[in-house]
Amino acid sequence: LTAEDPVEYEMEGIGQVQVKEGIGYTFEEALRSFLRQDPEVILVGEIRDKATVDIALKAALTGHLVFSTLHTNDAPSSITRLLNMGTPNYLISAALTLIMAQRLARKTCLDCRVIDENITPKLLNSIGFLPEQSARAKIYKGSGCENCSGSGYKGRMGIYEILEIDNELKAGVLSNLQQTELNAIAKKNGFRTMQDMGQDLLLSGDLSFAEYERVLQSN
């Protein structure tokens, strides 16, 4: 079952419900009605208030797979956002299993890309490249051609980060660790940020430095 605002794509085999806050049918009310039907999977289009998140997390603790969205800058800050909404840390620790954050970036046109001579090792170091990486890196940009209508970009691609809430992170949430401490635990256990993926795409020539800055260095 899904609760959406609005229902943008109709999918066969899925019960989709349109949220209508004007008549009092909110995400919270939709969730309550879903639980009476005991579905295996629930999608809540967006978590906007404490009541909705509490029901969603409790649903996750009673054998339902629950998906939803939340407005934050990255995956780790979703935990802080839930805490700031007044959600008890024990509920977050027990119910949350995975967080994914994503941005959409324009892909450099492969038909007209050239090396961007303005990108210096010092500039690459400033965004987290290691000196030995910066020294040999070749960063590309689109020069514009008929295949990309002169824009230098052709197509789009996702830039992602996926944070698995493992036992160490669950313990950190229960211990009321600060977000910086939770970030450190995640990185130690192999978490790669959107910036890390963006740097990989810079090195592969799929992402221009200008697009990296636009998508990943502005909130």
Range-by-range predicted roles:
Residues 1-219:
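Short, flexible helix-loop junctions that flank or precede catalytic/ligand sites
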